[in-house]
């Protein structure tokens, strides 16, 4: 009889509605806190992913055109700028064909801009960030990262007149150099299919850009300088020697980049 009473008492205690309510409230407290904590963690993670996505949307991929005589220099440049690809030619391809090869390879990358540097390019400090900031506000889909002295001679006086501008870009109908070029990735396949043959690569890209009504925008100052060394190309189409002094008019960085332009 005593055992029966104790059993009923235990059942009665287990079925006590007040105790059951207390147990339910106790069980639910930590669950509410866990859900709040989980939501915060998820939001932070989502923001991080959005930040990564933002960095990925305004990106560029860099390739380098190099000659075997400058292989060591080219490898240093590749490491400095974080280039994704480099083509080193011993002269069998030639300058123009090697440029085309690098542009063609870069089209495999899913980025907004494709950038080709020559092996004698000298990048500014903090080059990748400066390049991102400049390309984000570029006034043209065809950008030259270098504007040099000495060559071409017929443009030097015009550049000198524009050199005092406060604009962040100098614009011109012609691509004057091939030391550092950035082109919006969407245009590169069409460019490669329509480059005229038999021209130096800067003149070939100029001809294509003019036909497509693209102005060339030069970063001002130049984000790339030119190592004024003995040229790898012995004979030029114009048969004119390359004299010393082929360096950027201005080479440096900006705290911020805008779309302000000044025609050359």
What residue ranges belong to the model's regions?
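Peripheral/terminal regions associated with large enzymatic or DNA-binding modules
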Residues: 19, 28-45, 49-117, 121-264
